[in-house]
Amino acid sequence: MQTKTALVVLSIALGVGCSHRPEERRPAHAYRAEPRADWNKLGERWVDGTRDRDFIFVDTRARAYRRLMIVVENSALEMNDVVVHFADGSDFSPQTRHIFAANTRSHVIDLPGSWRAIRSVEFRYGNLPGGGRAQAELWAQ
C-alpha cells in the first residue's frame, strides 16, 4: 500500500515538474530599433511599388557612424541591395539581398574601417506581391 501511494505521489510530482508553458513570443513591434537610445534614426522611405530604389540623405556634419540596421514595417519587402555612399566619395555594399517580413529588422551591418561619415544610403528593392506599402527605415550607431 505504501509503495502504491509513493508511486502515485512520485507520478504527480513528475507530471507537475515536467509540465511547462509554451514560450511566450513577443510581438514583432517589440523588436523595433526605435526604443534603443544608442541608435539614431537616419531616415525612412515608403515603398509604393512604382520605384525600385530610393535614397536616404544624411547630414555629414551631424556625426560619424560604425554600424547600420534596416527596419521594415507594415508589409513585406524584398531588399535587393543597399549601397552606402560615404562623405569621402567611397561606397560600400554589404550584400544585403534579403526578403524582410513585415515588422522585422536586419542584422547589424558593420561599416568598413572605424567611424565613417555617411553622405547617403541607397535602397534597391521591390514590394512583394499581395502586400501593402512597406516602410524601410535606416538606423545607425
Where are these regions (language model features)?
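Beta-strand-centric surfaces of beta-sandwich/beta-rich domains
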Residues: 49, 81-83, 89-110
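Noncatalytic modules at the cell exterior or secretory-pathway interfaces
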Residues: 63-70, 113-128
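Bacterial N-terminal signal peptides that target proteins for export
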Residues: 1-7
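Short, surface-exposed beta-strand/strand-loop-strand elements in extracellular ectodomains
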Residues: 73-95, 133-140
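C-terminal motif of bacterial Sec signal peptides marking the signal peptidase cleavage site
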Residues: 16-17
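Short, surface-exposed binding/anchoring microloops in extracellular/periplasmic proteins
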Residues: 48-77
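Transition segment at domain starts
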Residues: 22-58, 94
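Exposed aromatic-hydrophobic patches
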Residues: 54-59, 105-113
